């Protein structure tokens, strides 16, 4: 769907995978750029915008002070992108329902109605990966967003591999989509936000370090596997296990090298290693000597631990339950702006 209200019925779709022609950007590289304080007039901007292209690499960029996303993939087709070693922070300063990294899919299978997507994919298995024909990889980045999510996969974003990232503020949100493999990330002072997942989505969330309890919204399905994660609070693990998740996960002190300075490598004695977490390269941002001297870095906040997830009061009326919209996640899941 190009827009929420414009659809081609799935029975009329072309089921040939990928693009009709090769007339689109391919194998381009955006590397070692310092991008900041943009979007002074037009607010719907991004430091790097990728759309209807394939195998685009975005590497070692420092991107900050923006009204919206630092890196945005609008339309996942045709996949194969690599987003790595970027430092993206102070984002979504003048808009909402977005992230430091943001994406949407809206591919051939997609509809704003979850039940419609489930019915389409059940009737035509494989339609969900006709457009993002190669995985999109997000690895070894530092993302920061105080007004949204550090990583925000929206509107059917599918076929992603996300690993070895430090999310220092807004956590990681996955709306409906398919085949998102998330491993070995660090979610500082936040958590995993899964709203409105689909049946048999094939999603994995494994070997991650998580600070606060998960924040699910309207979740009837939990993907393929959510397990072997490390929580910094006992409450986080307990809440996950109440949902039937994280049977083999643990909680405790991750033994970060120096959380106050933003060094989130764990010591050789860290209990996080027992659940499969591994240290990774954190050489974020520009590498050019002159640009590195000029580039800013995100403000590192104190590490929060033993933080619970407060739930708002529900009111019953005529057999139905009501509550106020209290979080950015609930606002996004309900499509309220």
Model-derived regions: residue spans:
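C-terminal recognition in membrane/secretory proteostasis and scaffolding
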Residues: 292-337
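C-terminal accessory segments
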Residues: 245-293, 297-298
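Extracellular, surface-exposed repeat architectures
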Residues: 43, 96, 110-117, 124-128, ...
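Predominantly extracellular beta-rich ligand-binding scaffolds that present long acidic/polar faces
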Residues: 159-261
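Active-site-adjacent structural elements in folded domains
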Residues: 16, 42-48, 87, 102, ...
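Short glycine/acidic-rich loop motifs that flank beta-strands on beta-rich extracellular proteins
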Residues: 1-4, 23, 39-46, 67-76, ...
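Surface-exposed loop/turn motifs in large extracellular/passenger domains
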Residues: 2-31, 50-57, 76-82, 106-139, ...
């Amino acid at each position: 769907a190009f827009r929420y209200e414009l659809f081609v019925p799935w029975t009329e779709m072309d089921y040939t995978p990928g693009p009709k022609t090769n007339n689109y950007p391919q194998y381009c590289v955006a590397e070692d750029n310092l991008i900041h304080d943009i979007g002074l007039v037009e607010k719907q901007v991004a430091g790097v915008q990728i759309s209807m292209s394939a195998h685009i690499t975005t590497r070692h960029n420092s991107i900050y002070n923006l009204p919206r996303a630092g890196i945005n993939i609008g339309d996942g087709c045709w996949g194969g992108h690599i987003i790595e070693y970027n430092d993206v922070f102070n984002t979504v300063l003048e808009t909402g329902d977005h992230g430091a990294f943001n994406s949407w899919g809206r591919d051939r299978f997609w509809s704003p109605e979850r039940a419609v997507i489930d019915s389409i994919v059940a009737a035509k298995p494989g339609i969900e990966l006709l457009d993002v024909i190669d995985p999109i990889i997000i690895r070894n980045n530092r993302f920061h967003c105080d007004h949204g999510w550090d990583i925000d996969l929206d509107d059917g974003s599918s076929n992603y591999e996300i690993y070895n990232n430090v999310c220092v503020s807004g956590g990681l949100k996955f709306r409906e989509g398919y085949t998102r493999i998330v491993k070995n990330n660090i979610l500082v002072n936040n958590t995993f936000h899964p709203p409105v997942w689909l049946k048999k989505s094939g999603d994995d969330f494994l070997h991650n370090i998580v600070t606060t309890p998960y924040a699910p919204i309207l979740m009837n399905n939990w993907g393929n596997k959510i397990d072997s994660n490390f929580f910094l609070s006992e409450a986080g693990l307990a809440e996950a296990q109440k949902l039937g998740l994280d049977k083999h996960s643990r909680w405790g002190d991750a033994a970060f090298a120096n959380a106050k300075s933003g060094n989130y490598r764990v010591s050789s004695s860290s209990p996080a290693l027992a659940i499969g977490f591994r240290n990774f390269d954190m050489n974020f941002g520009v590498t050019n000597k002159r640009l590195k001297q000029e580039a800013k870095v995100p403000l590192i906040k104190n590490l929060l631990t033993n933080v619970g997830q407060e739930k708002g009061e529900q009111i019953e009326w005529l057999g139905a339950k009501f509550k106020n919209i209290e979080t950015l996640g609930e606002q996004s899941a309900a499509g309220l702006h």
